[in-house]
Amino acid sequence: MACADIEEKTYSNKRHTSFYLSAGPVDGPVIIFLHGWPELSLSWRHQLPFFAGLGFHAIAPDMRGYGRSSVYEKHEDYRLEESVQDMLDLLDHLSVKQAVWIGHDWGCPVVWSIASHHPDRCYGVVNLCVPYGLERGLEFVIKYVDRNVYPVNDFPAGQWEYMRHYEENFEGATRPMDANPDTMLRAIFRCGSPEGQNQPAMTAYVRKQGWFGGLTEAPDVPRDDNIITQEELSIYVTYLRRNGFFGPNSWYMNHESNLDYSMKALNARRIDLPTLFLSARYDYTCETVTSRLAEPMRELCSDLTEQIIDAGHWIAQEKPVQVNRAITQWMFKALPELLTD
């Protein structure tokens, strides 16, 4: 890592190995950042040193199937319940009872599940882009599709058509990603834009057209340096070439088991912890600004703060200053005891 303040560490037990980045005082309150698809602990490079500077012990693991953490060969190994246990084991390894948990993309359902199944392990939770509810599976979130944008005859699963594509043709969905991780990441790591508002997201066409309209690999487009540097991109590419996309894509293959797990949550799935949700205005797949997608979260989270950031899906990289400020301001109000020392 380029930043000397960030250490690389590994924790292993009989069931799993977690590689993680660590920054800040080891006796500070713990804050754990969970990345999503198809990323790495590196995705939190703008957050780790910032929160370490506030006195937190800031941690970001490679989630299972990614980077230098354990990679598994069966879809069912990527159930949410498994990832939740990975994180609880990591917390035990750090010898602390609680943490502030922060998630993005698939990291969010893990954070929501920790909060709803193990609230005693949380000071509070923050999620970026993905509201509470997606851990209940594809059929559940389809109910909240905006049919003005996604007519049911054209897009039965709305913006989630790409998830159907994984279920119906997993190998076909994964093959073009494995063919060239470099062009794949350059194609998807892009800033948000207001131009896509009130139009179907690209993910809505994947089931009919494939990820890249029938191409055998992602188109060769310039890297968006507002999201990622060449050095950072090379790190992502190295590990996706080594591990492949089977693990990352398998996270999408467990909707039924994830629903079963969510039904076991405490307190009828209500979350009474201090909760912050950051919505990305230009994230048109996880669209929560004008659609009903965030309704279950608003019904089930009793201490919820929401804020909209003018960014696309890769919100923590595109607008790190705004994201860090929003989290810090929320902490001063919701968890002041963590910032007083």
Which residues does each PLM region occupy?
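Basic/polar N-terminal segments that are highly enriched at the extreme N-terminus
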Residues: 1-9, 337-341
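Flexible "cap/lid" subdomain of the alpha/beta-hydrolase fold that forms the substrate-access gate
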Residues: 2-6, 17-18, 30, 66-102, ...
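Conserved beta-strand scaffold positions in the cores of enzyme catalytic domains, especially
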Residues: 8-10, 58-60, 306-308
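A short loop-to-beta-strand scaffold at the N-terminal edge of the catalytic core in hydrolase folds
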Residues: 13-23
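Conserved HGGG/HGGXW glycine-rich cap/lid loop of the alpha/beta-hydrolase fold
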Residues: 21-71, 90, 104
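Active-site helix-initiating loop/hinge in glycosyltransferases
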Residues: 36, 79, 105, 318-319
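Signature tryptophan residues that serve as conserved aromatic anchors
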Residues: 37, 41-44, 106, 112, ...
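Catalytic active-site module of serine/aspartate enzymes centered on a nucleophile-bearing elbow/loop
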Residues: 301-341
